[in-house]
Design a protein with these regions (language model features):
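Helix-to-loop junctions at the C-terminal end of transmembrane segments
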Residues: 60-72, 156, 254-266, 350
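Helix-loop junctions at membrane interfaces in 12-TM secondary transporters
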Residues: 91-102, 286-297
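Structural signature of the two symmetry-related core transmembrane helices
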Residues: 75-88, 269-284
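Intracellular juxtamembrane helix-capping segments at the cytosolic ends
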Residues: 112-125, 306-319
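Glycine-rich segments within core transmembrane alpha-helices of 12-TM secondary carriers
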Residues: 132-150, 334-342
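Short amphipathic helix-loop junctions that connect adjacent transmembrane helices
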Residues: 29-45, 223-240
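Loop-to-transmembrane helix entry/capping segments in MFS-fold secondary transporters
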Residues: 43-44, 127-137, 237-238, 321-331
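C-terminal membrane-cytosol helix-exit motif in multi-pass small-molecule transporters
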Residues: 152, 171-190
Length: 350
């Protein structure tokens, strides 16, 4: 196939990001309202569902074994297709068992895709350009999310679209974009052949620790913040969509600049600033009793989270280039571990 100027690894990463966001952002935005309205979920059931969602994350380390059979790029396509199928089917199974099943299917695609995407990004991008490009990908994801939340706001607020229709459109869009990537982009090869076995290196200990602790923090945000908005403050689907739109407008405006900032000031200063800011945000979360203030904290947390790309660029600088694929799976598993532990400790199982 003759290659064109637009058929570059960077553009492929951008299209992958758009496809994933269209499906996953829809799933996340509708989840709390859908499970409460259609399946009468309580905190216990949502906790079980979120734990099921993390099971494939535990298995992310098996990525290296799959890569013995297929290329990383092809595996990314397959994972995105599975993600799209899982989301497309979600609206048609509004029962406890059905939601657990579709969540698991969606999660298999999502977690394997995220693992492979991290590996491919660090292989395809140079050390100098990685912070800026990773920041740009966050901005692209925010723009795609804005499209999703605008669609949700209009679809449920004015067009009265059903959950089934919205889920199917989102998952189908992801699947169609995946077919486009499969047929429209050539196979890119890594300059450095990747090791195809599991490994843990002592000199990567700080990267493992930062990734592990980041997983616990994200669980608080990903699960409790959204559920809090619906349960405590009575946010509707259109309210959640509007909040997410505001959030992603900020990310669209600042994410690329944050990536450039990380490249300029270095990973240590960037992460120090992030953690100091998050200390203030989560302290405020403990005392908030206003829906407006809760929404503001939600946006602030997302902005600080953009600085977490510094963890990836730090690893890119210290790692053996041949370790990207094998370490990505181990690192993603270390993100998932504290999440399930946190859910167990939260009392959702009791």
């Amino acid at each position: 196939m003759k290659e064109h100027a637009w058929q570059t690894p960077k553009n492929l990463l951008i299209v992958m990001t758009i496809a994933m966001t269209l499906a996953f952002a829809t799933w996340m935005a509708l989840l709390n309202n859908f499970v409460v309205e259609r399946a009468a979920f309580t905190g216990k059931e949502i906790g079980i569902l979120q734990s099921i969602r993390e099971i494939p994350g535990f298995l992310a380390f098996t990525t290296v074994f799959v890569l013995l059979l297929i290329r990383e790029q092809i595996f990314a396509y397959i994972s995105l297709a599975v993600l799209g199928i899982g989301v497309a089917l979600s609206g048609y199974f509004p029962s406890e068992a059905g939601l657990y099943l579709t969540t698991f299917v969606m999660s298999v695609g999502f977690h394997y895709y995220e693992t492979v995407k991290q590996s491919l990004s660090l292989q395809w991008l140079s050390i100098d350009e990685a912070p800026a490009v990773l920041g740009k990908l966050i901005a692209v994801s925010s723009v795609a999310s804005l499209v999703v939340y605008s669609f949700l706001w209009l679809g449920q607020g004015y067009l009265s679209l059903s959950y089934e229709t919205i889920y199917f459109v989102a998952g189908g869009s992801c699947f169609i974009l995946t077919l486009f990537m499969w047929l429209g982009f050539p196979t890119f090869t890594s300059v450095i052949p990747q090791r195809k076995h599991l490994l843990l290196r002592k000199r990567y200990w700080l990267y493992y620790a930062l990734t592990f602790m980041g997983g616990a923090r994200r669980q608080i945000f990903m699960v409790f913040a959204g559920f809090l908005m619906v349960e405590k403050f009575g946010y509707s689907v259109s309210d959640i969509a509007a909040l997410f739109m505001i959030n992603h407008l900020f990310n669209w405006a600042f994410a690329s600049r944050i990536g450039v900032l990380v490249g300029r000031i270095g990973e240590r200063r960037a992460l120090t600033f992030e953690y100091c800011g998050l200390f203030c945000v989560f302290t405020a979360y403990a005392f908030v009793d206003s829906a407006a203030w809760a929404g503001a904290l939600y946006v602030a947390d997302h902005l600080f989270f953009s600085l977490a790309i510094a963890i990836k660029t730090y690893f890119q600088k210290i790692a053996d280039p041949a370790d990207m694929a094998s370490t990505a799976g181990v690192a993603f598993t270390s993100i998932i571990s504290p999440r399930c532990l946190f859910q167990c400790c939260s009392g959702w199982y009791g």
